[in-house]
């Protein structure tokens, strides 16, 4: 399909991108119409897609897209979330019409509804998931292009691009490659210089991962603001007057001293220790615990045995 032109040949960096994204890895099942695009089969049952044929069909699809005079007449569809971001980026780069998400049945056949469209070319991400637009395109004679895996049905598909249409990196890379070739054939960008748009912008990103990355970035920014100041000790002020006596200027309240008459001890003074001293070892041991308690030696306010 490259026509023997060296400028249209697949470059080494393109092959490395295909291998890194896993575009050559097919499924474990094989459709009889996809046998011509399979190179070999691995020991674990996974089919390997021939990347040379992938590149040739990619160029053929790009030539079909460029042949449409009005870019808005090209309709790109992806019902699976792994290709929705890619088709939106492709539509913004090439000016085509996109349907990201659920395809409303009757868009190509029911002229009554407001969303009725008459495109001249249809591009889908997965023939199995996007079977409804493919079927409607066959009713109104719209040529179709599809990214097909080894187990994809090729019914109503005019140009099948063999690739891995399950992985998010492979799907994003294929749409990026297709957009780049379309812009090159239109003359928008040069083949001598690399395209400034990175393939990462076409990759699907999980919303949970995006939320985690934003949260981590916010925490990092907060921590950076906290430690942004300089760690310097406060400079002492030597111009303050020197204080010699710290008690000056402090008002101490005068407390009157209470006098007690002679013979009366001040409250709070403890009694002599010998008054309360008692020899506990001098008392005999009590054998009969049921007997009435004996009077104690100390004066505790009267020794009585009647506790009632």
UniProtKB/Swiss-Prot annotation:
Modified residues (N-acetylserine): 2
One GO-annotated biological process of the protein: rRNA processing
A Gene Ontology molecular function term of the record: structural constituent of ribosome
Region Laminin-binding: start-end pairs: 161-180, 205-229, 242-308
Main subcellular location of this protein, as a coarse class: membrane
UniProt site (Cleavage): 115-116, 133-134
[DE]-W-[ST] repeat ranges per the UniProt record: 230-232, 245-247, 279-281, 288-290, 306-308
PTM characteristics: Acylated. Acylation may be a prerequisite for conversion of the monomeric 37 kDa laminin receptor precursor (37LRP) to the mature dimeric 67 kDa laminin receptor (67LR), and may provide a mechanism for membrane association.
Keyword NADP annotated: no
Region (Disordered) location: 262-308
Entry's localization field: Cell membrane; Cytoplasm; Nucleus
Coiled coil: none
PROSITE patterns assigned: RIBOSOMAL_S2_1, RIBOSOMAL_S2_2
UniProt keyword annotations, A-Z: Acetylation, Cell membrane, Cytoplasm, Membrane, Nucleus, Receptor, Repeat, Ribonucleoprotein, Ribosomal protein
Organism superkingdom: Eukaryota
Gene Ontology CC: cytosolic small ribosomal subunit; nucleus; plasma membrane
Role of this protein: Required for the assembly and/or stability of the 40S ribosomal subunit. Required for the processing of the 20S rRNA-precursor to mature 18S rRNA in a late step of the maturation of 40S ribosomal subunits. Also functions as a cell surface receptor for laminin. Plays a role in cell adhesion to the basement membrane and in the consequent activation of signaling transduction pathways. May play a role in cell fate determination and tissue morphogenesis.
Subunit structure: Monomer (37LRP) and homodimer (67LR). Component of the small ribosomal subunit. Mature ribosomes consist of a small (40S) and a large (60S) subunit. The 40S subunit contains about 33 different proteins and 1 molecule of RNA (18S). The 60S subunit contains about 49 different proteins and 3 molecules of RNA (28S, 5.8S and 5S). Interacts with rps21. Interacts with several laminins including at least lamb1. Interacts with mdk.
Note: This protein appears to have acquired a second function as a laminin receptor specifically in the vertebrate lineage.
Family to which the UniProt record says this protein belongs: Belongs to the universal ribosomal protein uS2 family.
This protein's name: Small ribosomal subunit protein uS2
Organism this protein belongs to: Danio rerio (Zebrafish)
Lineage per the UniProt record: Eukaryota, Metazoa, Chordata, Craniata, Vertebrata
């Amino acid at each position: 399909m490259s026509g023997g032109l060296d400028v249209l040949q697949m470059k080494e960096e393109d092959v490395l991108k295909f291998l890194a994204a896993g575009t050559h890895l097919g499924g474990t099942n094989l459709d009889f119409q996809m046998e011509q695009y399979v190179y070999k089969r691995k020991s674990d049952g996974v089919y390997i897609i021939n990347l040379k044929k992938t590149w040739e069909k990619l160029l053929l699809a790009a030539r079909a897209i460029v042949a449409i005079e009005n870019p808005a007449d090209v309709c790109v569809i992806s019902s699976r979330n792994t290709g929705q971001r890619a088709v939106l980026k492709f539509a913004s780069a090439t000016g085509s019409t996109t349907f990201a998400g659920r395809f409303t049945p009757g868009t190509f056949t029911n002229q009554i509804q407001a969303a009725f469209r008459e495109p001249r070319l249809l591009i889908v991400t997965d023939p199995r998931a996007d079977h409804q637009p493919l079927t409607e395109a066959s009713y109104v004679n719209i040529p179709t292009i599809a990214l097909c895996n080894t187990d994809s049905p090729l019914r109503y598909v005019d140009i099948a691009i063999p690739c891995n249409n399950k992985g998010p990196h492979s799907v994003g890379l294929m749409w990026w490659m297709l957009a780049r070739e379309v812009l090159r054939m239109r003359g928008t960008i040069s083949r001598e210089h690399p395209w400034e748009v990175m393939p990462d912008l076409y990759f699907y990103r999980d919303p949970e991962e995006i939320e985690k990355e934003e949260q981590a970035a916010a925490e990092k920014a907060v921590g950076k603001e906290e430690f942004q100041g300089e760690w310097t000790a406060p400079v002492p002020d030597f111009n303050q007057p020197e204080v010699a006596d710290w008690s000056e200027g402090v008002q101490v309240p005068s407390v009157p001293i209470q006098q007690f008459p002679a013979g009366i001890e001040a409250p709070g003074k403890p009694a002599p220790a010998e008054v309360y001293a008692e020899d506990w070892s001098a008392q005999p041991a009590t054998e009969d615990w049921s007997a009435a308690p004996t009077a104690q030696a100390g004066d505790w306010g009267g020794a009585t045995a009647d506790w009632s």
